[in-house]
């Protein structure tokens, strides 16, 4: 009887409370991470072709890892709540081992997404080179990127990466297909009416600012990639920073059982 009572009193109630609260926050954060990264993999901004052509699409690889980690955080943290309430050494040890595995995978997801994001948006020259190489090119990648750029230029009312002069200052697949005297930039750089009819095609051709989109599309593309990366990396890092002290408390709790 005395032995059973002593065993039942092992572990401070305060520590148990901290573990329960800490793991509840982790499991809720895991669900949020899961939802966030599902949104990323759905590619709502539809910029994956830009990243795929460069071979720097590991932002999406990080998102797939984070989907696994988000669900795993939910499951393991739920188990951690039960382990803390049951006060069983083997359950706490199992919790620590599982959480450590998930922690390592989430670190990989955060680092992978952030480093590849930095490569894509730190300098517009990479995206400019892709645009000039593939826009209007008669290849599968060229057709895919042409559709992507057409959609972005229409929806965001922009032209080129930095502006319409990208098409004039550099050689491109578009220039090889369309001489400058015919059209110095893609016709979709022209301002349009609500029915998508050019307001003044001749004015657009000569570069009149009232009839031509003058801003570049890089701001929109960078914002799209940043939105994906912040959701994966920085929210992931925040979860990791919270999870570490919870794991340390669990280690201490394990030594008291």
UniProtKB/Swiss-Prot annotation:
- What's the source species for this entry? Mus musculus
From the UniProt record, report the name of the gene that encodes this protein.
Upk1a
Family to which the UniProt record says this protein belongs: Belongs to the tetraspanin (TM4SF) family.
- Pfam families given in the database record: Tetraspanin
SUPFAM superfamilies per the UniProt record, alphabetical: Tetraspanin (SSF48652)
Q: What is this protein called?
A: Uroplakin-1a
Instruction: Give the matching InterPro entries.
Output: Tetraspanin/Peripherin, Tetraspanin_animals, Tetraspanin_EC2_sf
> Which keywords are on file for this protein?
Disulfide bond, Glycoprotein, Membrane, Transmembrane, Transmembrane helix
**Residues on the Extracellular side?**
35-58, 112-229
Q: Assembly and interactions?
A: Homodimer; disulfide-linked. Interacts with uroplakin-2 (UPK2). Binds to uropathogenic E.coli fimH.
């Amino acid at each position: 009887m005395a032995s059973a009572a002593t065993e039942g009193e092992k572990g401070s109630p305060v520590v148990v409370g901290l573990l329960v609260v800490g793991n509840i926050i982790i499991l809720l954060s895991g669900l949020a991470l899961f939802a966030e990264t599902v949104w990323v993999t759905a590619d709502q901004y539809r910029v994956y072709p830009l990243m795929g052509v460069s071979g720097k699409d590991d932002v999406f690889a990080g998102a797939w890892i984070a989907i696994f980690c988000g669900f795993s955080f939910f499951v393991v943290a739920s188990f951690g709540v039960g382990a803390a309430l049951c006060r069983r050494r083997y359950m706490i040890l199992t919790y620590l081992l599982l959480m450590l595995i998930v922690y390592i995978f989430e670190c990989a997801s955060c680092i992978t997404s952030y480093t590849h994001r930095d490569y894509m948006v730190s300098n517009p020259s990479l995206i400019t080179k892709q645009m000039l190489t593939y826009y209007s090119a008669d290849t599968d990648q060229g057709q895919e990127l042409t559709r992507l750029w057409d959609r972005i230029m229409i929806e965001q009312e922009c032209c080129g990466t930095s502006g319409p002069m990208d098409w004039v200052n550099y050689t491109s697949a578009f220039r090889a297909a369309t001489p400058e005297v015919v059209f110095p930039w893609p016709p979709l750089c022209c301002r349009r009416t609500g029915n998508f009819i050019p307001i003044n095609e001749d004015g657009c051709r000569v570069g009149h600012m009232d009839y031509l989109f003058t801003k570049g599309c890089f701001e929109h593309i960078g914002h799209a990639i940043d939105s994906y990366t912040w959701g994966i990396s920085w929210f992931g890092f925040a979860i990791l920073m919270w999870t570490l002290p919870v794991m340390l408390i669990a280690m201490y709790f394990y030594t008291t059982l």
